[in-house]
UniProtKB/Swiss-Prot annotation:
GO molecular function, one term: RNA polymerase II cis-regulatory region sequence-specific DNA binding
Function of the protein: Orphan nuclear receptor.
DNA-binding region: 21-96
Alphabetically ordered keywords of this record: DNA-binding, Metal-binding, Nucleus, Receptor, Transcription, Transcription regulation, Zinc, Zinc-finger
SUPFAM superfamilies: Glucocorticoid receptor-like (DNA-binding domain), Nuclear receptor ligand-binding domain
Protein name: Nuclear hormone receptor family member nhr-100
Subcellular location: Nucleus
GO BP term, example: cell differentiation
Gene that specifies this protein: nhr-100
Major localization class: nucleus
Keyword Transferase: no
Residue ranges annotated for the NR LBD domain, each copy included: 141-409
Organism: Caenorhabditis elegans
Length: 437
């Protein structure tokens, strides 16, 4: 008994033979004619001719083993050209045809007459639907990156440790020490984004949420190999650059996920978008979040709703948002950060291509997602201004000697000396107005 496909080669299996003698040997289109020495359709003829004339080079992302068939022949041009040559299309015939055409046009004695092809013009490369999937599957490297990031996201969000309820968070810490051991700033208490009671935020909740978000975000930074590879000085700068934007991206996704019309916090409290409800919130919290909330909802949360953003896109965006090159970093630090940023951008591009219905759809979605990043960066700057106002004028926000928010949010803190905060506290205690340059 003959077993079906027993003698079929790998290339024949991935590129099935045409169903009739008049089919295109490249893609299987039933309307084939002999072009350049092989049976081919007008689309493949035009593709082959342009590729040879213009000396185009293509690159395959899947080891030169893509399926070439009529409906999906545009997926990989490298494999399509390889298939054209494999079935016997002659590149020399294309070159000689072009030579004859140029000579005829120069002489001007003979008018070149080109017969129009019905419907399927050779210059109209492909009639394939535009809504096809552009890629069969993601590369295994991308799958591993995404799987690792989703695992770490879940681990960090569910990381709980025993703590002393009498003193489990403080703002009195040096930045570098807080980065090295974020549990000094806040114990790893249970994260509760979706509280059933959903209380309005208070000044005490504001202080706690600032500290718990700091610990949560630093814990997440530590999951990225690029961050772990940096020296301490680069880590400190990178935290100051990206702590707020990454936090706002996280908050926005949780507000979108739990359909909260305002900012949702890690302890389950919230700050409302509705200004009528804001009247029930303490003035310090309104000063802190009032300016931020409208842009937060309109420009970030609503964009996530329109796109129906998923968690994979969110974690990849967080990594891109975090890894921002800057002239103040060391050269090695910038190299590490730039390489990592490109890695996560490629992973995001490939993931979006996989889940989209075509290149146009994928490009549009990628643009809309990337437009979120400058918005959360602006939200971070808004919070810098709000936090400075509150931390300098509200002892109930700072607590006793709480200078970490000031060091993180101050615009000139990247260049501050180690004793800068001590001097600022002395001025503040003497009630001398402090102006941020």
């Amino acid at each position: 008994m003959n077993i079906p496909f027993n003698s079929v080669s790998k290339i024949q299996w991935r590129n099935p033979s045409p169903v009739s003698d008049t089919s295109c040997l490249v893609c299987g289109d039933p309307h084939g004619k002999r072009h350049y020495g092989a049976m081919s359709c007008n689309g493949c003829k035009g593709f082959f001719r342009r590729s040879i004339w213009e000396k185009r080079t293509y690159k395959c992302s899947f080891n030169n083993e893509c399926i070439i068939e009529f409906k999906y022949r545009n997926r990989c041009r490298a494999c399509r050209l390889k298939r054209c040559l494999h079935v016997g299309m002659d590149a020399n015939a294309v070159r000689s045809e072009r030579t004859r055409k140029i000579k005829t046009e120069i002489d001007g004695d003979v008018k070149l007459e080109i017969k129009e092809e019905p419907a399927d013009s050779e210059d109209a490369d492909d009639e394939c639907p535009l809504d096809i999937k552009p890629d069969i599957a993601m590369a295994w490297q991308t799958k591993e990156i995404i799987a690792h990031m989703l695992y770490e996201e879940d681990r960090v969000l569910n990381w709980e440790e025993p703590y002393n309820k009498l003193r489990y968070y403080t703002m009195d810490s040096e930045v570098l020490q807080a980065i090295k051991d974020p549990s000094q700033v806040c114990a790893r208490t249970k994260i509760n984004w979706n509280s059933h009671s959903r209380p309005l935020i208070t000044i005490e909740a504001l202080r706690f949420n600032w500290c718990r978000t700091f610990t949560l975000t630093i814990d997440w930074f530590e999951t990225l190999p690029e961050y772990r590879a940096l020296i301490d000085d680069d880590k400190e700068l990178l935290v100051k650059f990206s702590l707020m934007p990454v936090g706002w991206l996280w908050y926005a996704y949780k507000s979108y996920e739990y359909r909260c019309d305002g900012i949702v916090f890690v302890d389950g409290s919230w700050f409302p978008r509705d200004k009528t409800i804001q009247q029930q919130v303490c003035p310090t919290c309104v000063l802190y979040y009032g300016r931020i909330t409208e842009s937060f909802m309109a420009d970030v949360v609503n964009s996530m709703k329109e796109l129906e953003m998923d968690e994979t896109e969110m974690v990849l965006l967080k990594a891109i948002c975090h890894l921002q090159p800057d002239y103040r970093l060391t050269r090695r630090g910038n190299d590490v950060i730039s390489t990592g940023r490109e890695k996560y951008k490629r992973a995001l591009c490939e993931y979006i291509r996989m889940k989209s219905n075509g290149f146009m759809d994928a490009s549009f979605r990628l643009c809309k997602l990337m437009q979120i990043l400058p918005v959360v960066d602006i939200l971070g700057k808004y919070e810098d201004e709000s936090a400075l106002l509150v931390s300098l004028g509200e002892t109930e926000f700072n607590g006793s000697g709480g200078g970490l928010p000031y060091d993180i949010h101050a615009s000139d803190s990247h260049f501050a000396r180690k004793n800068r905060r001590k001097s600022d506290n002395q001025y503040h205690q003497q009630h001398v107005p402090l102006h941020i340059q």
